[in-house]
């Protein structure tokens, strides 16, 4: 036996909240992912709705999605996500919220809509508020 002291880790493992991000604008997607990661979230970033829908078999704490994207739009992704994960927090960030939601597509109950342009700090604050609720 070595003469090394026994070290006990009394901290509890706490998983970072997981965010599924769907945004077709490359630069905005990268900025959002970095800002949310710096704020302590685990982020999986997808370039379109189809890519995001393919990730829905995993557990997520929040879906943050653009509405107008190639493939499945954000509302369709949100509906699929809400059906698979009841209680999932959903937030839309879009420049076309009024147009997209007025076209007869209703967002899942409890979803929040943020309009572009929006400052990264404001998005992080809104995500923090939604995660705390």
PLM regions with names:
Residues 30-38:
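Charged docking surfaces used in two-component/phosphorelay signaling
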């Amino acid at each position: 036996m070595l003469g090394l002291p026994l070290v006990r880790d009394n901290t509890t493992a706490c998983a970072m909240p997981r965010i599924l991000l769907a945004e077709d604008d490359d630069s905005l997607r990268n900025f959002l992912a970095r800002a949310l990661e710096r704020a302590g979230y685990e982020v999986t970033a997808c370039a379109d709705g189809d890519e995001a829908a393919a990730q829905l078999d995993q557990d997520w704490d929040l879906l943050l999605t653009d509405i107008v994207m190639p493939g499945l739009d954000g509302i369709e992704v949100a509906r699929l996500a809400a059906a698979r994960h009841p209680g999932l927090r959903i937030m839309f960030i879009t420049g076309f919220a009024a147009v997209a939601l007025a076209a007869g597509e209703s967002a899942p109950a409890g979803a929040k809509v943020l309009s572009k342009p929006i400052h990264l700090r404001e998005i992080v604050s809104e995500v923090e508020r939604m995660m705390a609720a």
